[in-house]
C-alpha cells in the first residue's frame, strides 16, 4: 500500500508541483488575498507589511547559505569522504541504503538540524555512489525525511525559546524548562518512534527495479582534488596561499573560541556555532587556505535558491504576523478544542501555518501568544502545547519544499524529484505525532 501511495504521490507532484520559487510567489499572493478577506487590513497596509518584512531574514539567509557551502566543503575533504564511504559501506543493497540513510538523517537532525540537513544529503549521495541500483531521488528524500525529528532534538527552536528569558511569551506562561519539552516522556516517545519506524516506511517506498530513476552520472562523480602542487620557484604570495601554517593558526583560534563557548554555555549549539565548527573543520581538513577556498567556490553554486527565496518568506511571515491572520488560524483550532484535544488541534494549526511560515522561531512569535493563554485556560499541559507547535511545523515540512533546498542543492536535484516520497512520509508520520500527543 505504501508503495502504491508513494508512486501516486510522485506522479502527482511531478505534474503539479512548481519550482520552489514559484511556490513562494504563489504563497505570497495567497496570503495577501486571504488576509484581505479575513482580517480588517487594506491592500495598502498589506503591501506595506510585505515590503517591510521582505528583508527581515537577511541574516538568517546568510546563515543558511553558509551552512550549505561550509558543510559541502567539509564533506568534500579527503578525511570526511573516507568516513562517509566507510559508513555507507554498511549498505549492501538498495533497500538497506534507503533504511540506513533515513536512520542516519533522523539521528543527525536530533543532534542539530543544520548539521543533519547537510550531512544527511552528503551521506545519501555517498550511498548512491556505492550501492548499484539505488534510486537516487528516494535516497535524497530519505535524508530530508530525517528532518522530521529536528523540532524535538537538541536544536529545536521552540522548546529552546520557551526556556529562554525574554522570549515573546514569557510574560504569559513564564519560562518552560526543557525537562517539560525536549526531555519529556512524550517527546522521547515521538522522537524514538520516528527514528525507528520511518526507515521501515521508506523501505516500502522502494520503486520496482524497472521504475528506478536513472541519474546523470556526473551528479555522482567524486569532486576534484582541491590541493595544488606548487613549483619550487613559486612566488611568496602563492606560498602564503598554500601555507598549512596559516591554516593551523586560524584553526587553533577557532578551536579555542569553541572551547570557551561550550564551557560557558554547555551543549547549546546554534546555527552560528555549527557554521563555525564546519568552517574550522573544513579549513583544517583541506590543509591550506586556497584549497579550502576552491572547495567553497565549488559549493557556492548550490545557494542560489535559498538566496532568492528567503526574502519572499520573510515578507509572508510579516504579513501573517502583523495582519493577524496567523492568530486567526490558531484561534479557529483552539476554539474547537478541549483540554484533551488541545495539543492535537494546536499541532494541526501549526502545520497549516507552516505553509506560509516555514520557520520554528516564526511560529513561536505568531502562535505562542494565542496558544499559551488558551492552554492555561483549558488546563492543558504547557510543555506539550509548546511541542505541539514544534511538531506541526516539522511535520508539514514534508510538504513544504523550503527546507528541502539545502539537500536538493547538494544533490543536484529538483523539488519534484523527492516531494512525492516526502508527502507519503507526511501521511504516515502524522500518526506517530497524534499518538504521542494523545496518549502521554
Protein language model features and the residues they cover:
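Hydrophobic transmembrane alpha-helices of multi-pass small-molecule transporters
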Residues: 1-69, 183-196, 200-305, 309, ...
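Flexible loop linkers connecting adjacent transmembrane helices
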Residues: 4-9, 45-50, 75-91, 125-135, ...
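Transmembrane-helix boundary/entry motifs in multi-pass membrane transporters
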Residues: 14-15, 51-54, 87-100, 129-134, ...
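Membrane-interface helix termini and inter-helical loops of multi-pass transporters
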Residues: 40-52, 166-178, 262-268, 322-335
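Juxtamembrane transmembrane-helix boundary signature
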Residues: 60-82, 108, 115, 288
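Hydrophobic alpha-helical transmembrane segments of multi-pass integral membrane proteins
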Residues: 90-123, 307-320, 334-373, 377-378
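Alpha-helical transmembrane segments of multi-pass membrane proteins
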Residues: 94-108, 133-154, 161, 173-179, ...
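Membrane-core helix-loop-helix motifs of multi-pass transport proteins
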Residues: 123-213, 403-436
Amino acid at each position: 500500500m505504501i508503495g502504491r501511495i508513494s508512486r501516486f504521490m510522485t506522479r502527482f507532484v511531478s505534474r503539479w508541483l512548481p519550482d520552489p520559487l514559484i511556490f513562494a510567489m504563489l504563497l505570497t499572493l495567497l496570503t495577501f488575498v486571504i488576509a484581505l478577506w479575513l482580517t480588517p487590513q487594506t491592500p495598502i497596509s498589506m503591501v506595506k507589511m510585505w515590503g517591510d518584512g521582505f528583508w527581515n531574514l537577511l541574516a538568517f539567509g546568510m546563515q543558511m547559505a553558509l551552512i550549505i557551502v561550509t558543510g559541502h566543503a567539509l564533506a568534500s575533504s579527503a578525511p570526511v569522504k573516507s568516513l562517509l564511504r566507510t559508513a555507507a559501506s554498511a549498505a549492501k543493497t538498495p533497500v538497506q541504503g534507503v533504511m540506513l540513510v533515513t536512520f542516519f538523517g533522523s539521528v543527525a537532525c536530533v543532534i542539530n538540524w543544520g548539521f543533519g540537513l547537510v550531512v544527511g544529503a552528503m551521506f545519501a549521495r555517498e550511498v548512491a555512489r556505492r550501492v548499484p541500483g539505488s534510486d537516487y531521488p528516494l535516497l535524497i528524500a530519505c535524508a530530508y525525511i530525517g528532518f522530521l525529528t529536528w523540532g524535538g532534538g537538541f536544536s529545536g527552536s521552540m522548546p529552546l525559546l520557551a526556556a529562554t528569558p525574554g522570549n515573546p511569551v514569557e510574560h504569559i506562561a513564564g519560562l518552560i524548562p526543557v525537562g517539560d519539552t525536549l526531555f519529556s516522556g512524550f517527546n522521547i516517545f515521538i522522537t524514538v518512534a520516528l527514528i525507528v519506524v520511518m526507515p521501515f516506511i521508506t523501505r516500502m517506498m522502494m520503486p520496482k527495479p524497472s521504475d528506478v530513476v536513472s541519474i546523470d552520472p556526473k551528479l555522482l562523480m567524486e569532486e576534484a582534488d582541491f590541493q595544488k602542487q606548487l613549483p619550487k620557484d613559486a612566488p611568496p604570495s602563492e606560498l602564503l596561499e598554500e601555507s598549512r601554517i596559516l591554516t593551523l593558526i586560524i584553526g587553533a583560534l577557532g578551536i579555542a573560541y569553541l572551547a570557551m563557548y561550550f564551557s560557558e554555555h554547555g551543549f547549546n549549539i546554534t546555527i552560528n556555532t555549527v557554521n563555525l565548527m564546519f568552517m574550522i573543520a573544513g579549513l583544517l581538513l583541506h590543509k591550506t587556505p586556497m584549497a579550502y577556498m576552491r572547495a567553497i567556490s565549488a559549493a557556492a553554486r548550490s545557494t542560489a535558491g535559498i538566496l532568492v527565496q528567503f526574502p519572499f518568506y520573510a515578507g509572508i511571515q510579516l504579513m501573517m504576523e502583523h495582519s493577524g491572520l496567523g492568530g486567526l488560524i490558531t484561534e479557529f483550532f483552539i476554539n474547537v478544542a478541549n483540554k484533551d484535544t488541545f495539543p492535537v488541534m494546536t499541532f494541526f494549526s501549526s502545520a497549516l501555518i507552516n505553509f506560509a511560515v516555514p520557520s520554528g522561531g516564526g511560529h513561536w512569535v505568531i502562535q505562542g501568544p494565542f496558544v499559551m493563554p488558551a492552554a492555561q485556560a483549558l488546563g492543558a499541559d504547557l510543555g506539550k502545547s509548546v511541542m505541539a507547535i514544534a511538531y506541526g511545523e516539522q511535520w508539514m515540512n514534508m510538504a513544504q519544499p523550503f527546507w528541502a533546498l539545502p539537500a536538493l542543492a547538494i544533490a543536484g536535484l529538483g523539488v519534484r524529484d523527492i516531494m512525492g516520497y516526502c508527502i507519503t512520509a507526511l501521511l504516515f508520520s502524522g500518526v506517530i505525532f497524534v499518538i504521542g500527543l494523545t496518549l502521554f
